[in-house]
């Protein structure tokens, strides 16, 4: 029995020596005793490939490459150690989730933390660490109870942590005893079964690529030393460490410590020990500067490198994106100009998660094949999401979010249906469910989904053919979504045990054809060359089956709730990872500086060399803190390295990365993150400057104009990248900056290609201005027709912003509807409630002034009850919260009807029209305009309320409009066409009064009635009558009145002098109007109505002529963009030269009337 220790610095040729030795052995005796090459998991593929490509051998039987886990499987298969099933990390996490729920009341520290996401995984990692370091549950319990830990900082926190962990550890071992094996037990079993393994006896074993070993692994190595014929240990170190452990500040502390322990064990076993120390740097024979870096990295003081050097490049970038794109360009240059293959290039990062997603995006753009080393989570795979969301549907009472998470995995889609069509149907159904608030038994009960595009609270319309077609499609889509999930729900309710629930879930997957659908996706991915994706589909299905099998194996007969079942499935799913091998040989390797292993790398890029990243700051996200670990170490408990030791080992990891390439090393760092926050360079960059004082940093930039013309050529990598950078350079040229001739040449090449449509579209965007051209008359006619029928509010929308009108009425764009009660819905309810009360009064031959308080309450209650089922898809009946809202609305309607009754008692005006229609089937004709361009425009709508009164002037009419917001009539808004409704309604009523009422009427005014439930604030105590009086004042109507005292007295018969409590007017002692009254003369009313008509005429002509410009107004701080639904469509941006608000000047009513009079005079003379 013998042991050889092979020692040398990085690049000295240790691995190559081992491979040569194995190859020589294979040539000498192809069928001799076994040769075992033991390496880390990440290195097995590389070493197998290196041995397999030996030119003069057609294959190998004698030599095999193993990791510890693969060696364990091999030995245990041959020696009978596989009698009990192994539980993977996934199975252990599911078991732990169950144990946590069962024992959380016994915890001292982790009662609350145990419910948090990720806790199960942290505990599993901790218990795995205990196993790796050969600590039994009893050891942990003893430490918790001994009081030793409690001395730590005078607190019992560590003791209580160990108490909680010992409970879970003990219960886990109890659950596994004699039935299953923890995934970490394989090494313990391996050590026990090596004496029985014939393959080990007489074997030659080579151990390479490791920096350190766990106690479990040391036990295995001890048995290998005892039973193998010869074992060779290869370790990266500057000298043998057989007399003492190295000092903790030495660069090779980690490997030196490992060397010492292995050497001591070999001595204990009386092995024949030989030593081989490799000096020199075989890897860097052609690159003396890299040899200098390897030799001097840890030297203090450093010896500067005086010669010319090209093998090292330090690069600074503005951000990570610029850094990665610069590296992609450099890789292209290495492959294109220097003759390298992609497989010769490696990219290493200390925090690869900062770059992972960006690597995929950038390398796809630059057409660089790559392989990202490491295991990716399966959580985002459609199958895992399908299972999780399906269980969420059952647990969450069929919330639409969970249902559509499930459906959008596309694993529920009908087999062999066109996916594009099904996706469209699913989107339509999702919009419907969001708008109608579909959840719970509304999915599963037999009632069909009812679809109505337009719903009125006042009228019932028959369904249109389009609505019927949509309704049928929605129900057909629902009919293939619900049955499988509903069947799963029924089976889960019936299932009691874990096995029954697992069977229900598996049957659900089978019945929805998930295996077949995944196989189709796998085949599609293979056909398209997406090899990794194809592997992932197969691995995901295998992982789910294994998860369910382990679940049933562990606790198949246990009765658990659906909630706990889901938690355990979630815990298991969170631990599932893809394990992939490189799908091709010629790829750039992207790895982790800590875990990845490389061999034969020519060029290495080290990314993200920033302060706090390289060397990395240790994190303390584990169950035990660094202080906990340090304390346990002082009492002889060995665990994995704490933060302090990990920080000491960082320089070794950096050294290994820097010495990994044979030809070129690139070190880069960004100076800002994605949010623009400053990032500082690492101390390593400073160290490189000391070692190479003549070296100049390069700048990696995505702005070619910052580098020379020759360097700008590097940006022309391929067509898509060239298009992007050419566009950015031409954009500078449009701003009158000089650009290199490189880009004009590139532009000419791109535009001369046969396939130049994409380039043409891209470059045309350089001259884009966020403007909309006026529609051609023919297009306008196709959109609107020769005869426009619209509403007053539509004209107001046009005057506010022509593009908003075009989006809503030309393109018919609509916002997604949500199942929630909004202000327009409440306003609609108030209007319709007051109409119903008015209709009931008319039926009972009552007047508003006759209403009692009890009648107000009864009528209001009945009105809201009748309307609630029609309002916003029955939202007021959908929940207890909305029932409460309904009661509040009933109280408001009661309050309002009481105020209207009081107003009626104090008024000479009486209602003669409620919800009075004009146009269509209404009693009044539409407001019609013959436009100059030959089109006709009709305005139709409804007037909330028209009141009449008899006076010495004859018949008076006024308009009352119900508003759920406090509003008055702003004549500036009237002038600019933003508030046209009230004067239009008055105009129509007056114009057609002779035909409608039998006599010509005079305008009395327009008033807004604010529907609300006011709160009264007072510094003094008030009696009930005083409170009612204050509330009454809050309902004062605002608007514009005819400036006549008789009219004012008719509107408020209680008014003698002073301000009215009913209208915004008042009388002086002599009976004349107060100056603060909102009143004008009859002539001014005539001017205003004529101005409104002119405004309609102009708007109609502009609409039909095709005006669609992006021109929102701005008056004071008010702009229609604030609540516009189409901001994302027009993309109005005030910072753009062509986008400016249309300024409207706010003036007093007197000034506005003067403007209108001047315009009217001008029109008369023209």
Swiss-Prot record:
Which keywords does UniProt give here? 4Fe-4S, ATP-binding, DNA damage, DNA repair, DNA-binding, Exonuclease, Helicase, Hydrolase, Iron, Iron-sulfur, Metal-binding, Nuclease, Nucleotide-binding
Outcome reported for the amino acid change (mutating residue 73 to A)? Reduced recognition of the Chi sequence, reduced generation of the Chi fragment
Outcome of mutating residue 801 to A: Loss of iron-sulfur group binding, loss of DNA-binding
| GO molecular function annotations of the record | 4 iron, 4 sulfur cluster binding; 5'-3' exonuclease activity; ATP binding; double-stranded DNA binding; helicase activity; metal ion binding
Effect recorded for residue 44 to A: No longer recognizes the Chi sequence nor generates the Chi fragment
Record keywords: Acyltransferase included? no
The UniProt annotation places [4Fe-4S] cluster binding at 801, 1121, 1124, 1130
Question: Could you give the cofactor binding note from the entry?
Answer: At low magnesium concentrations there is no nuclease activity, but helicase activity is unaffected. Binds 1 [4Fe-4S] cluster.
Q: Which Gene3D superfamilies match?
A: 3.90.320.10, 6.10.140.1030, P-loop containing nucleotide triphosphate hydrolases (3.40.50.300)
Q: Does the keyword Lyase apply?
A: no
| Residues the record lists as binding ATP | 10-11, 14-16, 236, 283
Catalytic activity, EC: 3.1.-.-
Q: Relate the outcome reported for changing residue 213 to A.
A: Wild-type Chi fragment generation
Ranges of residues in domain UvrD-like helicase C-terminal: 281-586
Top EC class for this record: hydrolase
| Effect noted on mutating residue 1124 to A | Loss of iron-sulfur group binding, loss of DNA-binding
Q: What does this protein do?
A: The heterodimer acts both as a highly processive, ATP-dependent DNA helicase and as an ATP-dependent single-stranded exonuclease, acting in both directions. Recognizes the B.subtilis Chi site (5'-AGCGG-3') which transforms the enzyme from a helicase which degrades both DNA strands to one with only 5' to 3' exonuclease activity. This generates a double-stranded DNA with a protruding 3'-terminated single-stranded tail suitable for the initiation of homologous recombination (Chi fragment).
In its miscellaneous comment, the UniProt entry states: This enzyme is a functional homolog of the RecBCD enzyme; unlike the RecBCD enzyme it degrades both duplex strands symmetrically.
Q: List the PANTHER family.
A: RECBCD ENZYME SUBUNIT RECC
What name does UniProt use for this protein? ATP-dependent helicase/deoxyribonuclease subunit B
């Amino acid at each position: 029995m013998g042991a050889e220790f092979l020692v040398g610095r990085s690049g000295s040729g240790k691995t190559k020596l081992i491979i040569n030795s194995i190859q020589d052995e294979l040539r000498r005796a192809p069928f001799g005793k076994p040769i075992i090459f033991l390496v880390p998991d990440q290195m097995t593929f590389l070493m197998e490939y290196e041995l397999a490509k030996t030119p003069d051998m057609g294959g190998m039987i004698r030599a095999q490459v193993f990791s510890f886990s693969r060696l364990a499987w091999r030995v245990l298969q041959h020696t009978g150690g596989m009698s009990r099933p192994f539980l993977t990390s996934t199975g252990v996490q599911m078991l732990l989730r169950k144990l946590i729920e069962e024992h959380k009341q016994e915890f001292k520290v982790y009662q609350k933390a145990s419910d948090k996401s990720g806790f199960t995984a942290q505990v599993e990692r901790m218990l795995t660490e205990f196993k790796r370091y050969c600590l039994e549950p009893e050891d942990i319990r003893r430490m918790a109870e001994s009081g030793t830990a409690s001395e730590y900082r005078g607190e019992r926190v560590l003791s209580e942590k160990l108490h909680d962990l010992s409970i879970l550890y003990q219960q886990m071992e109890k659950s596994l005893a004699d039935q299953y094996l923890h995934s970490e037990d394989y090494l313990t079993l391996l050590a026990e079964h090596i004496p029985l393994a014939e393959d080990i006896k007489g074997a030659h074993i080579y151990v390479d690529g490791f920096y350190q070993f766990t106690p479990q692994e040391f036990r295995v190595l001890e048995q290998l030393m005892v039973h193998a014929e010869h074992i060779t240990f290869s370790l990266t170190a500057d000298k043998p460490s057989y007399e003492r452990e190295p000092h903790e500040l030495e660069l090779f502390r980690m490997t030196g410590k490992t060397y010492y322990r292995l050497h001591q064990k070999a001595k204990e076993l009386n092995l024949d020990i030989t030593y081989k120390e490799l000096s020199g740097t075989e890897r860097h024979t052609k690159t003396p500067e890299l040899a200098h870096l390897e030799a001097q990295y840890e030297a203090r003081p450093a010896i500067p490198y005086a010669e010319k050097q090209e093998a090292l490049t330090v690069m600074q970038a503005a951000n990570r994106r610029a850094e990665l794109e610069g590296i992609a360009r450099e890789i292209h240059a290495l492959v294109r100009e220097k003759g390298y293959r992609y497989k010769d290039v490696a990219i290493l990062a200390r925090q690869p998660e900062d770059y992972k997603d960006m690597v995929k995006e950038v390398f796809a753009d630059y057409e660089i094949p790559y392989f990202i080393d490491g295991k990716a989570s399966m959580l985002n795979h459609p199958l895992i999401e399908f299972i999780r969301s399906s269980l969420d549907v059952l647990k969450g009472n069929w919330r639409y979010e969970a249902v559509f998470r499930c459906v959008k995995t596309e694993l529920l889609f009908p087999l062999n249906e066109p996916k594009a069509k099904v996706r469209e149907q699913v989107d339509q159904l999702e919009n419907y469910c969001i708008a109608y608030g579909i959840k719970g038994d509304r999915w599963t009960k037999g009632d069909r989904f009812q679809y109505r595009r337009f719903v009125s609270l006042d009228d019932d319309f028959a369904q249109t053919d389009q609505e019927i077609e949509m309704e049928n499609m929605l129900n057909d889509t629902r009919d293939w979504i619900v049955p499988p999930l509903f069947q799963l729900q029924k089976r889960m309710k019936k299932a009691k045990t874990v096995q029954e629930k697992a069977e229900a879930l598996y049957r659900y997957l089978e019945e929805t054809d998930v295996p077949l659908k995944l196989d189709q996706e796998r085949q599609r991915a293979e056909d398209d060359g997406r090899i990794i994706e194809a592997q992932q589909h197969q691995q995901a299905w295998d992982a789910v089956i294994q998860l369910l099998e382990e679940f049933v194996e562990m606790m198949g007969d246990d009765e658990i709730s659906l909630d706990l079942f889901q938690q355990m499935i979630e815990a298991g799913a969170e631990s599932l990872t893809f394990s992939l091998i490189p799908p091709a040989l010629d790829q750039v390797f992207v790895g982790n500086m800590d875990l990845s292993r490389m061999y034969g790398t020519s060029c290495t890029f080290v990314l993200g060399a920033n302060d706090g990243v390289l060397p990395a700051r240790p994190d303390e996200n584990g169950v035990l803190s660094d202080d906990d670990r340090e304390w346990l170490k002082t009492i002889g408990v060995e665990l994995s390295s704490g933060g302090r030791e990990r920080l000491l080992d960082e320089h070794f990891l950096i050294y290994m990365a820097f010495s990994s390439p044979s030809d070129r090393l690139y070190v880069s760092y960004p100076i800002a993150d994605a949010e623009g926050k400053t990032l500082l360079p690492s101390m390593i960059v400073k160290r490189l400057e000391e070692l190479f004082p003549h070296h100049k940093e390069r700048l990696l930039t995505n702005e070619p104009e910052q580098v020379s013309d020759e360097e700008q050529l590097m940006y022309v990598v391929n067509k898509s990248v060239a298009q992007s950078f050419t566009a950015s350079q031409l954009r500078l040229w449009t701003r009158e900056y000089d650009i290199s001739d490189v880009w004009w040449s590139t532009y000419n090449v791109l535009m001369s290609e046969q396939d130049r449509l994409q380039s043409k579209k891209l470059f045309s965007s350089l001259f884009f201005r966020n403007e909309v051209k006026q529609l051609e008359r023919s297009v306008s006619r196709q959109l609107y027709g020769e005869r426009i029928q619209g509403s007053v509010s539509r004209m107001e929308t046009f005057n506010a912003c022509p593009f908003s009108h075009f989006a809503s009425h030309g393109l018919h764009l609509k916002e997604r509807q949500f199942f929630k009660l909004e202000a327009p819905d409440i306003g609609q309810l108030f209007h319709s409630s007051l109409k119903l009360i008015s209709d009931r009064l008319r039926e009972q031959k009552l007047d508003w002034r006759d209403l009692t308080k009890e009648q107000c309450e009864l009528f209001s209650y009945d009105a809201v009850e009748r309307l609630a089922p029609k309002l916003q898809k029955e939202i007021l009946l959908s929940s207890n919260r909305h029932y409460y809202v309904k009661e509040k609305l009933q109280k408001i309607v009661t309050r309002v009807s009481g105020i209207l009754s009081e107003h009626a008692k104090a008024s000479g005006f009486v209602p003669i029209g409620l919800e009075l229609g004009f146009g269509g089937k209404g009693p009044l004709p539409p407001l019609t305009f013959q436009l100059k361009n030959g089109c006709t425009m009709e305005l139709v709508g409804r007037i909330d309320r028209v009141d009449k009164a008899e006076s010495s002037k004859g018949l008076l009419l006024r308009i009352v409009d119900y508003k759920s917001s406090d509003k008055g009539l702003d004549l500036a808004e009237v002038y600019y066409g933003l508030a046209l409704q009230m004067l239009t309604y008055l105009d129509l009523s007056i114009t057609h009064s002779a035909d409608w009422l039998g006599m010509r009427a005079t305008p009395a005014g327009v008033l807004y009635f604010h529907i609300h439930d006011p709160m009264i604030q007072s510094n003094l105590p008030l009696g009930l009558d005083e409170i009612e009086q204050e509330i009454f004042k809050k309902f004062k109507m605002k608007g514009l009145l005819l400036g006549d005292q008789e009219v004012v007295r008719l509107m408020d018969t209680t008014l003698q002098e002073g301000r009215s409590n009913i209208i915004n007017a008042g009388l002086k002692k002599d009976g004349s109007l107060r100056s603060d009254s909102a009143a004008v003369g009859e002539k001014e009313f005539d001017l205003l109505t004529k101005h409104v008509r002119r405004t309609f005429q102009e708007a109609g002509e502009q609409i039909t002529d095709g005006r669609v410009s992006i021109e929102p107004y701005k008056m004071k701080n008010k702009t229609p963009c604030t609540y516009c639904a189409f901001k994302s469509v027009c993309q109005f941006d005030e910072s753009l030269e062509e986008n400016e608000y249309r300024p409207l000047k706010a003036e007093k009513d007197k000034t506005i009337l003067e403007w209108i009079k001047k315009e009217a005079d001008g029109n008369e003379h023209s």
